[in-house]
Swiss-Prot record:
Gene3D superfamilies, sorted: YVTN repeat-like/Quinoprotein amine dehydrogenase
Domain of life: Eukaryota
Name of this chain's protein: U3 small nucleolar RNA-associated protein 18 homolog
Keyword Phosphoprotein assigned: yes
Disordered, as annotated region: 1-44, 69-126
Gene Ontology CC terms, in alphabetical order: germinal vesicle; nucleolus; nucleus; Pwp2p-containing subcomplex of 90S preribosome; small nuclear ribonucleoprotein complex; small-subunit processome
Source organism of the structure: Drosophila melanogaster
Name of the gene: wcd
Length: 506
């Protein structure tokens, strides 16, 4: 059909519509129609609604005009308004969400195919049998209930185009709380669970002397006085054995994994130590240089280049990790009990059998500073937090002092920020977790003598350990790289393992 013919047809329709409208206005507002009313006896047999013949043949006047307009390919100006009046609850096409799928059977299904007159429903003459059943249900639902807000399509802003996938998830999944994801570690109660022992696959190490988690893999190294070191997979359920390293007539007093994760060092009371290549599974026996007679207590620097070890009569030896070369020897008052590295590998803090703590400067190869541990008579252990803000010292009297690391250089008798007196026997070991939010303290002289402290509140968890928890005599502890696990080395065969549920990953 050409455009000229369409325009002519539209003009005829408009004139026809105006004529019909004038006739409608001239008619009275209400026309009384005479209707045959059957008797009561005939009412049951007759069950119909009388419809004018002109409506049956041609439909409503407005519908007739609409159909005529469609036949000439044009749309009346007020069609949209009429559709909105007929379906007030129906959303605009632009506001409608795109259906995830469409079923052609739903479009073909009509009301007459579903709705059948029964003795319960009565006559259904008020329904249009040729109407789509889908539209019928939609209109019925919208009449009963308004569309909920969550079903309304929101207008997308230009600023939301760069929203990350995480924000998309948080916006669509309502039960995820952004604040809960970034919440702080609870300071009153700790959510934990004791899982299977770390060395449950063998229990062959004897009295465990040291534990260390691998820095990059989900594995842990357990060494004992039987001269056996085992690497276990850490999952909290099976904890399968991955590899064994046996050293004949060499009781393992201390073992450490290098920060690179490819090499491990094992020391004892012998005048030599072992370096083990974890990738090639090869061991190297190295003789201690100089006058060194044992290596039963040592630590590897965070950079992996140096090893500091305790000697006789307060001697502190500094070795190279690769070449086994003695770089320097320091001397302090009293027997060396413990030491810890600074994160930049430039300082070593050492505690001894006296009340003094020494700070060694590796650049100048001298003792940079000495201060007295407040209230301490005999020192036992020392640990510097990973964030370099807190320094924890443990004494033989069972007291744990917490210092501000920067403030210890300003005085020879600094005052601690916090003092823990929850344990009554010598503090054997101190360990901070990776985020410096937890401090684990233990004593090997009493059963189940270990506690966890929360920072920055500086409070001790009252529910850890549990009231009837049996762990044994704890000699040392270790956190996994992301603090999800906490393991204890004991004087027995077991290495208890705890899962800290607040921390995710490994």
């Amino acid at each position: 059909m050409s455009s000229d013919e369409s325009s002519d047809g539209l003009e005829e329709l408009q004139s026809l519509k105006a004529l019909y409208g004038q006739q409608e206005q001239e008619k009275p507002a209400k026309i009384k129609r005479e209707r045959y009313i059957p008797k009561a006896s005939q009412a049951k047999e007759l069950n119909y609604v009388e419809v004018p013949m002109e409506k049956v043949l041609f439909g409503d006047r407005q519908r007739l005009l609409t159909n005529l307009a469609k036949s000439v390919g044009q749309k009346l100006p007020n069609d949209d308004e009429d559709e909105q009046e007929e379906n007030p609850g129906q959303a605009k096409p632009g506001d409608k969400r795109k259906a995830a799928w469409s079923d052609s059977d739903d479009e073909d299904l009509q009301v007459g195919d579903v709705k059948k007159a029964t003795k319960h429903t009565g006559p259904l003459n008020h329904l249009r049998k040729d109407k789509s059943y889908k539209e019928y249900l939609t209109a019925r639902f919208q009449r009963t209930l308004n569309q909920p807000k969550w079903a309304e399509k929101k207008v997308k802003n230009e600023d939301d185009e760069d929203v990350s996938s995480d924000e998309e998830l948080l916006r669509t999944v309502g039960f995820i709380d952004r604040k809960a994801r970034n919440s702080d570690l609870p300071q009153k109660t700790l959510n934990f669970k004791r899982v299977k022992d770390l060395n449950r696959a063998t229990y062959a190490e004897g009295n465990a002397t040291s534990i260390q988690f691998h820095p990059t893999s989900t594995a842990a190294l357990v060494a004992g006085m039987n001269g056996l070191a085992t690497i276990y997979a850490v999952d909290g359920q099976k904890n399968e054995r991955l590899h064994n390293m046996r050293f004949k007539k060499f009781p393992l007093a201390c073992s450490r994994i290098a920060p690179c994760g490819t090499r491990a060092f094992f020391g004892s009371v012998k005048p030599f130590y072992y370096s083990y290549d974890l990738l090639e599974a090869k061991e190297s026996k190295l003789k201690l240089p100089g006058a060194m007679e044992f290596m039963h207590r040592f630590e590897v620097s965070p950079c992996g280049k140096f090893i500091v070890t305790a000697g006789k009569f307060g001697a502190i030896h500094l070795l190279t990790a690769k070449t086994n070369e003695l770089l320097h020897s320091f001397k302090q008052e009293g027997k060396v009990k413990g030491f810890t590295w600074s994160s930049d590998s430039k300082r070593i803090l050492v505690c001894g059998s006296t009340s003094n703590v020494s700070v060694l400067n590796l650049r100048q190869n001298l003792i940079e500073h000495i201060f007295m541990d407040d209230g301490c008579i005999h020192g036992e252990s020392i640990q510097l937090s990973p964030n370099q803000r807190l320094l924890a010292t443990g004494s033989q009297e069972g007291v744990v002092n917490i210092y501000d690391y920067e403030s210890i250089f300003a005085s020879k008798a600094p005052q601690p920020e916090k003092r823990f007196m929850n344990l009554r026997t010598a503090i054997t070991d101190l360990q901070f977790n990776h985020s410096s939010e937890l401090l684990a303290m233990c004593s090997s002289e009493a059963p189940n003598a270990f506690k966890l402290a929360h920072f920055p509140s500086a409070t001790v968890y009252s529910n850890f350990p549990a009231q009837n928890e049996k762990v044994g005599f704890v000699t040392s502890m270790a956190f996994s790289p992301h603090s999800s696990f906490l393991a204890f080395a004991t004087k027995g065969k077991q290495v208890p393992l705890f899962r800290l549920k607040y921390f995710k990953g490994y």
